[in-house]
């Protein structure tokens, strides 16, 4: 947050979507205004336990629309957000760095199979296109959840500039695209400004830059 306030915007929301969680950090007058504990952050829309890889699909919803029918889903650990992220081209196979639920490769074919299992099925019973449609249904739920929480933080602090970073940047762009339609909000991408490697390791990059600036300041004073 300190790096963002010093180098990008002193009044904004930093949204960092990793593999497991999404952090929503309000920055006001150059200082992080977020709550201190995870419990408080969960209670105040500043922490979401949804990420771009590890979140079980059954956590997002216990029913989805399938063939124009509201359909119950299995609560077993069959598929995760990494599967829908990969199938919908929000991440690459290399980005899918966690273990898969079934221990099989992190490729699109196996992701489609894992997604079909959420409906206690397989690609013999439903088609690949239908499995993609399941992924789309879950993706809509995922981005709506992110948008809902970011909007609440925005309304609470009156912040309109949003800095996005992390493995889930492409997901965040989709989630927050509705906000940019009004021209009131401005989305700033760390990946577009500093590159993908920095977006994937923003905390480490930020610390290194802050330490460098501090060292330069000391040298200038000496």
UniProtKB/Swiss-Prot annotation:
GO molecular function, one term: hydrolase activity
Pfam families: Hydantoinase_A
Pathway(s) annotated for this protein in UniProt: Cofactor biosynthesis; methanofuran biosynthesis
Top EC class for this record: transferase
Keywords, sorted A to Z: Transferase
EC number of this enzyme: 2.5.1.131
Gene3D superfamilies according to UniProt: conserved archaeal protein q6m145
UniProt cross-references to InterPro entries, sorted A to Z: Hydantoinase_A
Substrates-to-products reaction catalysed: gamma-L-glutamyltyramine + [5-(aminomethyl)furan-3-yl]methyl diphosphate = (4-{4-[2-(gamma-L-glutamylamino)ethyl]phenoxymethyl}furan-2-yl)methanamine + diphosphate
Function, in words: Catalyzes the condensation between 5-(aminomethyl)-3-furanmethanol diphosphate (F1-PP) and gamma-glutamyltyramine to produce APMF-Glu.
Sequence similarity: Belongs to the MfnF family.
Protein name: (4-{4-[2-(gamma-L-glutamylamino)ethyl]phenoxymethyl}furan-2-yl)methanamine synthase
Species name: Methanococcus vannielii
């Amino acid at each position: 947050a300190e790096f963002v306030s010093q180098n990008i915007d002193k009044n904004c929301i930093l949204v960092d979507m990793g593999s497991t969680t999404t952090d929503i950090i309000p920055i006001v007058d150059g200082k992080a205004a977020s709550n201190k504990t995870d419990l408080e952050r969960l209670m105040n829309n500043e922490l979401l336990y949804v990420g771009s890889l590890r979140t079980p699909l059954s956590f997002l919803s216990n029913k989805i629309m399938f063939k124009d029918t509201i359909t119950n889903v299995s609560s077993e650990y069959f598929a995760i957000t990494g599967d829908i992220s990969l199938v919908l081209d929000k991440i690459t196979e290399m980005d899918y760095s966690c273990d898969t639920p079934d221990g099989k490769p992190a490729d699109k074919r196996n992701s489609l199979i894992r997604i079909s299992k959420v409906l206690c099925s397989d690609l013999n019973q439903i088609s690949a296109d239908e499995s993609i449609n399941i992924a789309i249904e879950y993706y809509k739920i995922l981005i709506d959840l992110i948008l809902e929480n970011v909007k609440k933080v925005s309304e609470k602090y009156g912040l309109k500039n949003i800095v996005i970073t992390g493995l889930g940047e492409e997901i965040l762009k989709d989630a927050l695209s509705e906000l940019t339609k009004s021209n009131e909000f401005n989305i700033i991408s760390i990946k577009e400004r500093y590159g993908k490697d920095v977006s994937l390791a923003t905390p480490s990059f930020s610390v290194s830059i802050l330490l460098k600036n501090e060292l330069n300041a000391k040298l200038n004073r000496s």
